[in-house]
């Protein structure tokens, strides 16, 4: 280490000049901090203390006085010399000269949902897809006997009955019956929606309190909540298969016994829009949403009874909140009754009287999916305003979350 003599303040070895005086780094740092002190030290009684003695600096007042006596000048203290401050100041200067960094939205003067909007591609005339036959089939499902007999002795309450119904939907020999899709087009989309709608109808038909509702209530609940039912049920199914290593990460369930890998499948939107998938990137759901939810489900590892309560709470809460009035009252009564059954399940069957933390995690997952659905509805409303889609459904409310 090069030496430039002794510090003019404390007498220690120094390496250079600071604030106009040959001084050590310690005294230089001390003098640099001195102007920022919020309190002042009282006058020293001795007024001539040894600055550095026995490895310690004794009196701050005398040390500061000595710094001033040897010629240290506060005007020579330079501010904003650290790397963070310097980079911030540089960024401010760049912004002042060139303006803020431009995103594509800022550069083109369009919000992200209009980034690729081309008026000549807008679809002012729509092709109507008739889905009334689905409602007719659902009505017939509600008129016939439930999938699982209510006289079965294998269940304790209606929540357990729903659990048996959902378990019956899933294939037994899953390794041989899963079909991996590589392309999603018109036929695949319509088939998956039909399967999901009718499966949700069959599931609801196994709930006695639901079947006691008026016909219009049952259909309204189904039409407004089947997509919520599908979203959560398929993620729970994918979580089970990923946990048991039947499916790898990034592979989702998308139909009855079918799945797709997000990184491998091709989507064909030509049947429903004139825009490309790249142009519609704003309107498409990010893949991270589904995988994050599946990871949360794997960590929680809910039982079949818990899964059915989660699905019931999500769907009925969504349907009741949307319709209000008598239907809201009916859905709240059903949820309350099933919450009591869930309590009995925890206390009597699994011997878990303190289940509040687990229930909170379940409801957190449901709130996340509810938030996704709100975002999806808003984006679909924007798409309708700008005629992004060239098809419409005969019952638009059934597909407002697609």
From Swiss-Prot:
Give the family from UniProt: Belongs to the nuclear hormone receptor family.
DNA-binding residues (ranges): 4-79
What does this protein's UniProt record list under function?
Orphan nuclear receptor.
UniProt keywords, alphabetically: DNA-binding, Metal-binding, Nucleus, Receptor, Transcription, Transcription regulation, Zinc, Zinc-finger
GO CC annotation: what is one? nucleus
Does the keyword section mention Translocase?
Answer: no
Q: Which organism is it from?
A: Caenorhabditis elegans
Q: Which residues form the signal peptide?
A: none
Instruction: Enumerate the spans annotated as NR LBD domain.
Output: 154-402
GO molecular function of the protein, one example?
Answer: DNA-binding transcription factor activity
Where does it mainly reside? nucleus
What does the organism's lineage look like at the top?
A: Eukaryota, Metazoa, Ecdysozoa, Nematoda, Chromadorea
Listed PANTHER family: NUCLEAR HORMONE RECEPTOR FAMILY, NUCLEAR HORMONE RECEPTOR FAMILY-RELATED
Zinc fingers (NR C4-type): which spans?
A: 7-27, 44-67
Which residues form each disulfide bond in the chain?
Answer: none
Record keyword Repressor present: no
Q: What is this protein called?
A: Nuclear hormone receptor family member nhr-96
**Alphabetized InterPro entries for the sequence:** C.elegans_Orphan_NR, HNF4-like_DBD, NHR-like_dom_sf, Nucl_hrmn_rcpt_lig-bd, Znf_hrmn_rcpt, Znf_NHR/GATA
User: Pfam families under this entry?
Assistant: Hormone_recep, zf-C4
Where does it live in the cell? Nucleus
């Amino acid at each position: 280490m090069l030496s430039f003599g002794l510090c003019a303040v404390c007498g220690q070895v120094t390496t250079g000049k600071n604030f106009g005086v040959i001084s050590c780094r310690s005294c230089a740092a001390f003098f640099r901090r001195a102007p920022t002190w919020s309190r002042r030290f009282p006058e020293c009684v001795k007024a001539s203390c040894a600055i550095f003695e026995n490895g310690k600096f004794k009196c701050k007042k005398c040390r500061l006085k000595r710094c001033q006596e040897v010629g240290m000048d506060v005007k020579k203290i330079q501010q904003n010399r650290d790397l963070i401050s310097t980079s911030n100041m540089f960024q401010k200067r760049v912004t002042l000269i060139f303006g803020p960094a431009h995103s594509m939205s800022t550069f083109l003067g369009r919000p992200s949902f209009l980034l690729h909007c081309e008026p000549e591609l807008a679809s002012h005339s729509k092709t109507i897809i008739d889905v009334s036959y689905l409602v007719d089939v659902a009505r017939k499902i509600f008129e016939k006997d439930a999938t699982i007999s209510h006289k079965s002795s294998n269940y304790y309450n209606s929540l357990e009955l729903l659990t048996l119904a959902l378990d019956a939907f899933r294939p037994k020999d899953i390794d041989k019956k899963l079909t991996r899709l590589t392309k999603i087009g018109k036929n695949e989309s319509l088939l998956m929606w039909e399967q999901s709608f009718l499966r949700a109808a069959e599931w609801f038909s196994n709930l006695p309190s639901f079947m006691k509702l008026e016909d219009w209530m049952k259909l309204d609940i189904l039409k407004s909540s089947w997509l919520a039912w599908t979203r959560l049920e398929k993620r729970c199914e994918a979580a089970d298969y990923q946990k048991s290593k039947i499916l790898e990460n990034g592979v989702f369930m998308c139909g009855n016994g079918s799945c797709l890998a997000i990184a491998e499948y091709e989507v064909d939107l030509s049947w429903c829009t004139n825009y490309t998938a790249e142009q519609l990137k704003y309107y498409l759901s990010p893949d991270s949403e589904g995988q994050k939810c599946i990871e949360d489900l794997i960590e929680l590892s809910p039982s079949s009874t818990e899964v059915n309560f989660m699905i019931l709470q999500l769907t009925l809460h969504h349907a009741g909140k949307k319709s209000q009035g008598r239907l809201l009252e009916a859905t709240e009564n059903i949820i309350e009754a099933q919450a009591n059954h869930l309590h009995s399940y925890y206390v009597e069957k699994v011997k878990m009287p303190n289940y509040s933390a687990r229930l909170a995690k379940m409801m957190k997952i449901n709130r996340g999916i509810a938030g996704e659905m709100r975002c999806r509805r808003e984006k679909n409303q924007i798409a309708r305003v700008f005629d992004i889609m060239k098809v419409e459904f005969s019952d638009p409310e059934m597909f407002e979350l697609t």
